[in-house]
């Protein structure tokens, strides 16, 4: 037990020193890169055979390509061998002079990370380009907007077509592929859509407007009034001087009726009452038995 403990204490671990590297190089020059376990048995180094081999392969070989990037041929070789052997980095490194298994492993891991980053960026770009929110912001652009015309039959507004504008983009649940710049048409339900905000007085206004227009047309056609036309008709009578009277008369030619005014009311008949008759006239207006029910005034 004590011997085994002593041997374990003799095995050295940790970083290598320059003196140990020099002993290992001299051993390889003399015996070649083999018999790694004999180095410790001969008492040359207190290192295990595995530690001596890895130190030589990864750090002390003369043809190592330390700090050099993989060439295009080396990258192609690693990709082909990895698809054939899998993650056998030490075996793949034997096909690449000057490359260690750690070099191959580091190259492969960095390549995988780079590819994953590229794929992630491309997926983000594709998802943002096909995002429905970004595509919905360009829908519903009304270009051919037709105004609402006024009906000639009345004062109501008749809605013929409903157009799509940018202000109702949030209210119309259609995509840009379905709507676009086209005009939405209402289905024919047999009902005429009319809006008459002043329908309570349209009939009266229209009637007055038509009557006044007809009167204006008649006045434009016949410039003389009915009374003037009657007077002109009487001029053909040979006794029209008797009708008109002398020219120097101050009285009017003829008295025309006033059709636009009501006839004057009948004048009231009033008689003059003297001062002496005022009291009697005032009392005569009361009935005769008015004072029968009045109590006499008591004497003082």
Swiss-Prot record:
GO terms for molecular function, please?
A: DNA-binding transcription factor activity; sequence-specific DNA binding
Per UniProt, residues of the HTH myb-type domain are 8-64, 65-116
What does the record list as GO biological process? cell cycle G2/M phase transition; generative cell mitosis; pollen sperm cell differentiation; positive regulation of DNA-templated transcription
By its UniProt entry, which InterPro entries does this protein fall under?
A: Homeodomain-like_sf, Myb_dom, Plant_Male-Germline_Reg_TFs, SANT/Myb
**Annotated region (Disordered), positions in chain:** 123-145
Cite the record's tissue specificity text. Answer: Confined to inflorescences, especially in stamens and pollen.
Sorted alphabetically, the keyword list is: Activator, Cell cycle, Developmental protein, DNA-binding, Nucleus, Repeat, Transcription, Transcription regulation
The residue ranges flagged as biased composition, category Low complexity, are: 123-135
- Residues annotated as DNA-binding are 36-60, 89-112
Described by its record, this protein's role is as follows: Transcription activator that acts as a positive regulator of male germline development by promoting both gametic cell specification and cell cycle progression. Binds to canonical MYB sites 5'-AACCGTC-3', 5'-AAACCGC-3' and 5'-AACCGT-3' in promoters to trigger the expression of male germline-specific or enriched genes (e.g. MGH3, GEX2 and GCS1), including those required for fertilization. Required for sperm cell specification leading to pollen maturation by activating a germline-specific regulon.
Matches recorded under SMART domains: SANT
Protein name in UniProt = Transcription factor DUO1
Q: What happens when the gene is disrupted?
A: Loss of male fertility. Reduced expression of germline-specific genes (e.g. MGH3, GEX2 and GCS1). Blocked generative cell division resulting in the formation of bicellular pollen grains at anthesis. Pollen fails to enter mitosis at G2-M transition associated with reduced levels of CYCB1-1. Blocked generative cell division followed by endocycle during pollen maturation leads to single larger diploid sperm cell unable to perform fertilization. Enhanced polytubey (e.g. multiple pollen tubes entering ovules).
Entry's induction text: Repressed by the microRNA 159 (miR159); the production of miR159 is stimulated by the anaphase promoting complex/cyclosome (APC/C). Activated by ARID1 in male germline cells via specific histone acetylation regulation (e.g. H3K9Ac).
Q: Which GO terms describe its cellular component?
A: generative cell nucleus; nucleus
Q: Where is the composition biased (Basic residues)?
A: 136-145
Q: Which cysteines are joined by disulfide bonds?
A: none
């Amino acid at each position: 037990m004590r011997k085994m403990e002593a041997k374990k204490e003799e095995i050295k671990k940790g970083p290598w020193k320059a003196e140990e590297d020099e002993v290992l190089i001299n051993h390889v020059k003399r015996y070649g890169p083999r018999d790694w376990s004999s180095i410790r048995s001969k008492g040359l180094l207190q290192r295990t055979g595995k530690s001596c081999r890895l130190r030589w392969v990864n750090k002390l070989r003369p043809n190592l390509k330390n700090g050099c990037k993989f060439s295009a041929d080396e990258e192609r070789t690693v990709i082909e061998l990895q698809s054939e052997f899998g993650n056998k980095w030490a075996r793949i490194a034997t096909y690449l002079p000057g490359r260690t298994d750690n070099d191959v492993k580091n190259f492969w891991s960095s390549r995988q990370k780079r590819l994953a980053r590229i794929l992630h960026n491309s997926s983000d770009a594709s998802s943002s380009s096909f995002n429905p929110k970004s595509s919905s912001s360009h829908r519903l652009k009304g270009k051919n907007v037709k105004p609402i015309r006024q009906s000639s039959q009345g004062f109501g507004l008749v809605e013929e077509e409903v157009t799509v504008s940018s202000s109702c983009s949030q209210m119309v649940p259609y995509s840009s592929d379905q709507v676009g710049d086209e005009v939405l048409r209402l289905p024919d339900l047999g009902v005429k859509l009319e809006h008459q905000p002043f329908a309570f007085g349209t009939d009266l206004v229209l009637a007055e407007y038509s009557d006044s227009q007809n009167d204006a047309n008649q006045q434009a056609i016949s410039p003389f009034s009915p009374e003037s036309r009657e007077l002109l008709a009487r001029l053909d009578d040979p006794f029209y001087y008797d009708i008109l009277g002398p020219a120097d008369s101050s009285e009017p030619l003829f008295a025309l009726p006033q059709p636009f005014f009501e006839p004057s009311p009948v004048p009231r008949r009033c008689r003059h009452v003297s001062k002496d008759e005022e009291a009697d006239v005032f009392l005569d207006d009361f009935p005769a038995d008015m004072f029968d029910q009045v109590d006499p005034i008591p004497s003082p």
